[in-house]
From Swiss-Prot:
Keyword Lipoprotein in record: no
Membrane topology value: Multi-pass membrane protein
InterPro entries: Auxin_eff_plant, Auxin_Efflux_Carrier, Mem_transp_PIN-like
Complex and partners: Homodimer.
Disulfide bonds: none
Source species, domain of life: Eukaryota
One GO cellular component term noted in the UniProt record for this chain: cell periphery
GO terms, molecular function: auxin efflux transmembrane transporter activity; identical protein binding; protein homodimerization activity
GO biological process: auxin export across the plasma membrane; auxin polar transport; auxin-activated signaling pathway
Tissues showing expression: Expressed in roots and shoot apex.
Keyword Transport included in the entry's annotation: yes
Protein name: Probable auxin efflux carrier component 1d
Region described as Disordered: 214-243, 277-298, 356-390
Organism of origin: Oryza sativa subsp. japonica
Length: 558
């Protein structure tokens, strides 16, 4: 039976996180302490140092030889069940698509375990778990390890597979089956392209004597010339050569859609920004925000042209300076921008009515646009005679996707922190080696700030968004149902199937009811696959997560 003391322990663990988030929100919305440029600096620190070091701290201090394999099996089975059901739906239903498979998989299986899960589950089940021989904090760390190393990598694989399909369909609609190899230039880090999506990539085919094609993928001439124009607007002290970045972190994006080069930071009007933030009306007044059909959102003119927002970026573009003039809504990237469509006039601020199906546009049957801000894309269903569009051999596509996923992973600091944490924990617990005190203290002084800074950063993100519910009420309700009902239900079934009972079963179910993870939203933003839905799931889900998890906690404790 849950007592008042138990609830107090839970609130003691979780309320401080919401205090940090609320302070950040108030600092921007009400008190006007931070400008968007300052927010980007805070979040750059969080993305580069605080969160990776926090991950390293938790993973490196977790005993890998005492992992609960049955608990991990339940978590893995849940994700495999959801993935299999979604794949079957896409295969058998005309309303299914790869975009929706990715989005629904993210919503139902990838919670915010690192930031919310560890403190919340410790507060709920620290005593009961210890009595049952299950450390709830350690179990959450084990889930974090699998998320960082396996499931986020799988997400990247699916996103790059989607990008590869679109690239091949658009540029080789009739000859794709003849492709025997791909070579990708080193400055291309994603098949999603840059601000214009796959349109910013060009593929050059070389036909051999055997009739087979060998394709080279590089940035398009127009995107390179845009980059040159962007460099021309910079200070003479800056180099004209592209600067390669292997960092990952935060970017600032303008709410206005524009394809004109924008000098970095020079056009921002802080007074107007605070004016806009103060009145709280900018989300509803945004022209084109709810545009339907095939209409593009109209550019917003007037005082609101300088309002910016930021997203967390899990990977960086190889040309960080170029991003200042990308088609990504007049973006100002504070460091290595992601290669995504962050505000393209083809639908970055528009969303369709609540529907899973693709709608035929008046321009023709081959142009279809997924609901909720997914990239408008050419998706030929057949070749005009009812046959599916041909694709290159599976081995060729797999090699191409693996190359792109590898380029993403090596630019993500969380990849290094997770792997180094696993390696050190294996060495430390196998041979009893302790980390030198100087190194341990150097890490802990930053990792100790990780939880608070991560929540503070999330509060800044919420304050800079035009609307909390960005995808419409219907889609938001559906996303919350998937996040807080479907995910825990499938986890309960998977846990029972592998034999979890008692406290372990309760921990597994509550863990599945945590708010939406940040990283899936970052990926959705970079690849422009329903980013409004994931944004709503992160922001609104965080607001309602505490009462929902408390309800699960109380019901399971009856």
């Amino acid at each position: 039976m849950i007592t008042v003391v138990d609830l107090y322990h839970v609130l003691t663990a979780v309320v401080p996180l919401y205090v940090a988030m609320t302070l950040a929100y108030a600092s921007v919305r009400w008190w006007r302490i931070f400008s968007p440029d300052q927010c980007s600096g805070i979040n750059r620190f969080v993305a580069l140092f605080a969160v990776p070091l926090l991950s390293f701290h938790f993973i490196s201090t977790n005993n890998p030889f005492a992992m609960n394999l049955r608990f991990l099996a339940a978590d893995t089975l849940q994700k495999l069940i959801v993935l299999a059901l979604l794949a079957l739906w896409c295969r058998l239903s005309a309303r299914g698509s790869l975009d929706w498979l990715i989005t629904l998989f993210s919503l139902s299986t990838l919670p915010n375990t690192l930031v919310m899960g560890i403190p919340l589950l410790k507060g709920m089940y620290a005593a009961a778990g210890a009595a049952a021989g299950a450390d709830s904090g350690s179990l959450m760390v084990q889930i974090v390890v699998l998320q960082c190393i396996i499931w986020y990598t799988l997400m990247l694989f699916l996103f790059e597979y989607r990008g590869a399909r679109l690239l091949v369909m658009e540029q080789f609609p009739d000859t794709a089956a003849s492709i025997v190899s791909f070579r990708v230039d080193s400055d291309v880090v994603s098949l999603a392209g840059g601000g214009g999506g796959a349109a910013e990539l060009q593929a050059e085919a070389e036909v051999g004597d055997d009739g087979k094609m060998r394709v080279t993928v590089r940035k398009s001439t127009s995107s390179r010339s845009e980059a040159a124009c962007s460099h021309g607007t910079q200070s003479h002290s800056q180099s004209m050569q592209p600067r390669v970045s292997n960092l990952s972190g935060v970017e600032i994006y303008s709410l206005q859609s524009s394809r004109n080069p924008t000098p970095r930071g020079s056009s921002f009007n802080h007074a107007e920004f605070f004016n806009i933030v103060g009145n709280g009306k900018h989300g509803d007044e945004e022209k084109g925000a709810a545009g339907g059909g095939g209409h593009s959102p109209q550019p917003v003119v007037g005082k609101r042209k300088d309002l910016h927002m930021f997203v967390w970026s899990s990977s960086a573009s190889p040309v960080s300076e170029r991003a200042a003039a990308a088609a990504a809504a007049g973006a100002v990237h504070v460091f290595g921008g992601g290669g995504a469509d962050h505000g393209d006039a083809k639908g970055a601020q528009a969303y369709d009515e609540y529907s899973f199906g693709n709608k035929n546009e008046k321009d023709g049957p081959t142009l279809s646009k997924l609901g909720s801000n997914s990239t408008a894309q050419l998706r030929p269903k057949d070749d005009g005679e009812g046959r599916a569009a041909a694709m290159p051999p599976a081995s060729v596509m797999t090699r191409l996707i693996l190359i792109m996923v590898w380029r993403k992973l090596i630019r993500n600091p969380n990849t290094y922190s997770s792997l180094l944490g696993v390696i050190w924990s294996l060495v430390s617990y196998r041979w009893g080696i302790e980390m030198p005190a100087i190194i341990a203290r150097s890490i802990s002084i930053l990792s100790d700030a990780g939880l608070g800074m991560a929540m503070f950063s999330l509060g800044l993100f919420m304050a800079l968004q035009p609307r909390i519910i960005a995808c419409g009420n219907s889609l938001a309700s559906y996303a919350m149902a998937v996040r807080f009902l479907v995910g825990p239900a499938v986890m309960a079934a998977a846990s029972i199937a592998v034999g979890l009972r008692g406290v372990l079963l309760h921990i597994a179910i509550v863990q599945a009811a945590l708010p939406q993870g940040i990283v899936p939203f970052v990926f959705a933003k970079e690849y422009n696959v329903h980013p409004n839905i994931l944004s709503t799931a992160v922001i609104f889900g965080m607001l309602i997560a505490l009462p929902i998890t408390l309800v699960y906690y109380i019901l399971l404790g009856l």
